[in-house]
């Protein structure tokens, strides 16, 4: 039995779950999410909790059991509280600006990099060097934050670039030169 998969998911107040066959939809104060569930995994609502069980002990059912439980738990957390990812921009002259759902990054290229956020993702900028990406879909949020970071990943010599808040960037020594 999967250690993660067998744990029940508590349902917060104001969150409703609708399960129709292999289609799951979760509604809450922040919005609603839908997901198609894989076969051989059964999701059931029992009062104020959601349980995830598997149909049989096949390899695919065992593989997906913990995954589906985590995905459903992330959906419930997302519609209840939402998720947030913070990125820091380091480097002389590097800065960001947000206008609506567009993010403009000035990170050392000849032209500013403009990114349009997908639907359901909000972006804010604090003091030109902190980008806050928020939304209810954890998977989409992580992918969006990774795309922003990929515009200028932190380099190991001076540490310039876009990094996640709290991310450790391993530094390298530069060339020592001949004397």
From Swiss-Prot:
A GO BP annotation: cytoplasmic translation
SUPFAM superfamilies in alphabetical order: Ribosomal protein L6 (SSF56053)
Keywords: Ribonucleoprotein, Ribosomal protein, RNA-binding, rRNA-binding
One matching Pfam family: Ribosomal_L6
Gene Ontology CC terms: cytosolic large ribosomal subunit
Transmembrane segments: none
Domain of life: Bacteria
GO molecular function: rRNA binding; structural constituent of ribosome
Function description: This protein binds to the 23S rRNA, and is important in its secondary structure. It is located near the subunit interface in the base of the L7/L12 stalk, and near the tRNA binding site of the peptidyltransferase center.
SUBUNIT field: Part of the 50S ribosomal subunit.
Family to which this protein belongs: Belongs to the universal ribosomal protein uL6 family.
Name of the protein in question: Large ribosomal subunit protein uL6
Gene assigned in the entry: rplF
